[in-house]
UniProtKB/Swiss-Prot annotation:
InterPro entries: PP2A_PR55, PP2A_PR55_CS, WD40/YVTN_repeat-like_dom_sf, WD40_repeat_dom_sf, WD40_rpt
Ranges of compositional bias, category Basic residues: 447-461
WD repeats: 19-58, 81-122, 166-204, 215-255, 274-312, 329-370, 477-507
GO molecular function, one term: protein phosphatase regulator activity
Annotated source species: Candida tropicalis (Yeast)
Gene that produces this protein: CDC55
Signal peptide region: none
SUPFAM superfamilies, per the entry: WD40 repeat-like (SSF50978)
Subunit structure: PP2A exists in several trimeric forms, all of which consist of a core composed of a catalytic subunit associated with a 65 kDa (PR65) (Subunit A) and a 55 kDa (PR55) (Subunit B) regulatory subunit.
Entry protein name: Protein phosphatase PP2A regulatory subunit B
GO biological process, any: negative regulation of septation initiation signaling
Domain of life from the UniProt record: Eukaryota
């Protein structure tokens, strides 16, 4: 996979001059990939649409609309200020030309309907201008029939439903069910089930609040519905466990159907492992077979058929293990990184520091076949040369025309199967701990790479000790963290939130 920098939205100023309200707090592609939504700490939602005027084999977006989703409020009963920050955005599938999405801050969820309306005005009449009186020289021959002509297009965003007063604690997750009729919302101690058409009633399906709050040992950190089976959902905890529940078993799903938990040697426990083991995000693969979980140090891939241990553990922040004291002092250890599955259901993506994000191709590798094959989900837009046991891009501008012709022959990015060789990224690795990683940077260096024609990404194999991410840097800038990202559902394009900027990288 060769990802190229495509475009960037937002002010390119220094990080010290950034307004807090402009920092992006969530980013999400819709189900088609034609629209992209971002939410920020100022309570605003900004929508981008695919630029259809560009050539077919490109991934560029343009501004569509912006609206204020949430405002700061004050809870007078608890004497608490409720921030306007957008925690999550989730798209609904639309049956017509309108767009629908859910947005939430710490307490209130809103269902928005975005429509593009055409404004028509009367273009001809029989009045004499400002006096609005019939013209004095009017005759039968000069009478004009009123005509409506298109004057302008107006994009309106209206809150159709407001789901409030159901959470006593901060909402960290919302997830739309595959039936497109219900969704769940999760806070620190409870998960509620909503019907999209009913705003004043929800059902509590998980409640881990103890009778005595002094006995509280864990909180809910993330929750998501299964992408195909509407009765299944999962939620993660600060103890590093993932629980899969079936709503058919009981109205209150406190008894989980499965629990995904890895045994850890008690002798290795310390003050920091209690914090770093907390799961910040969980995602189902698109086919519902696998789960990707992200904690501060690792990404873990779980098979739904195996609960006792993950099928792969990727050490993302191994280079920070000796610096956990520093991360604790500056609160970086509490950063909540997201994780995303690619459209091939095998590759995963997550963020790190220094404005870096990492893609792990074929992180899910079943190796069932004698001659393993991998789906070419990541088509190349340039020639490759073999170097150091894996493929690297050769920057040759003369090949661009040939590459465009090759791209047009492909009907579906996820259909072509390529035989895997020993050194190819899709082959079954001899060492289970080995994993290819692709590192990219979402900052000004992306502009320089695009201008110079150099490829912005670095590719390497990690073995045993995990990721080498950040080893080249003496200093880690903890202020430049990539927490929020989204993967295009049908293409090899990703959207990255870097403080107040939105970066688009694509293979197209």
């Amino acid at each position: 996979m060769n990802l190229d920098f495509s475009q960037c939205f937002g002010d390119k100023g220094d990080i010290e001059n950034i307004t807090e309200a402009d920092i992006i707090s969530t980013v999400e592609f819709d189900h088609t990939g034609d629209f992209l939504a971002t939410g920020d700490k100022g309570g605003r939602v900004v929508l981008f649409e695919r630029n259809q005027s560009k050539k077919k084999q490109s991934c560029e977006y343009k501004f569509f609309t912006e609206f204020q989703s949430h405002d700061a409020e004050f809870d007078y009963l608890k004497s608490l200020e409720i921030e306007e920050k957008i925690n999550k955005i989730k798209w609904l599938k639309s049956a017509n030309d309108s767009l629908c999405l859910l947005s939430t801050n710490d307490k209130t969820i809103k269902l928005w309907k975005i429509q593009e309306r055409q404004i028509k005005l009367v273009s001809e009449n029989n009045l004499n201008g400002l006096n609005h009186l019939p013209s004095s020289n009017i005759g039968i021959e000069s009478l004009k029939l009123p005509q409506l002509q298109l004057h302008d297009k107006l994009i309106s965003a209206q809150p159709k439903k407001i789901y409030a007063n159901a959470h006593a604690y901060h909402i960290n997750s919302i997830s739309v069910n595959s039936d497109q009729e219900t969704y769940l919302s999760a806070d620190d101690l409870r998960i509620n089930l909503w019907n999209l058409g009913i705003a004043d009633q929800s059902f509590n399906i998980v409640d881990i609040k103890p009778a005595n709050m002094e006995e509280l040992t864990e909180v809910i950190t993330s929750a998501e519905f299964h992408p195909l089976q509407c009765n299944l959902f999962m939620y993660s905890s600060s103890k590093g466990t993932i629980k899969l529940s079936d709503m058919r078993s009981n109205s209150l799903c406190d008894s989980h159907a499965k629990i995904f938990e890895e045994y850890l040697d008690p002798s290795s426990h310390n003050f920091f492992t209690e914090i770093t083991s907390s799961i910040s995000d969980v995602k189902f693969s698109h086919d519902g077979r696998y789960i990707a979980s992200r904690d501060y140090m690792t990404v873990k891939i779980w098979d739904l058929a195996m609960e006792n241990k993950p099928i792969k553990t990727i050490d993302v922040h191994e280079h920070l293990r000796e610096r956990l004291c520093d991360t604790y002092e500056n609160d970086a250890i509490f950063d909540k990184f997201e994780v995303q599955f690619g459209g091939d259901n095998k590759s995963v993506m997550t963020g790190s520091y220094n404005n870096q994000f990492v893609i792990y191709p074929n992180a899910v590798n079943t190796g069932n076949d004698d001659k393993p094959k991998f789906k070419s989900a990541f088509k190349n837009s340039s020639k490759r040369s073999k170097k150091n046991g894996f493929s690297t891009r050769t920057t040759d501008d003369d090949d661009d025309d040939d590459d465009d012709d090759d791209d047009e022959e492909a009907d579906d990015e996820f259909d072509e199967e390529v035989p895997a060789t020993k050194n190819s990224p899709g082959s079954q690795l001899e060492d289970d701990d080995e994993q290819e990683e692709i590192i990219l940077q979402a900052d000004k260096s992306a502009f320089k790479s695009k201008k110079s024609g150099q490829h912005p990404m670095r590719r390497r194999m990690t073995s045993g000790v995990g990721s080498n991410l950040g080893r080249e840097f003496d200093d880690v800038d903890f202020k430049k963290s990539i927490l929020h990202l989204s993967w295009h559902p049908r293409e090899n394009s990703v959207a990255i939130a870097a403080t107040n900027n939105l970066y688009i990288f694509s293979t197209l």
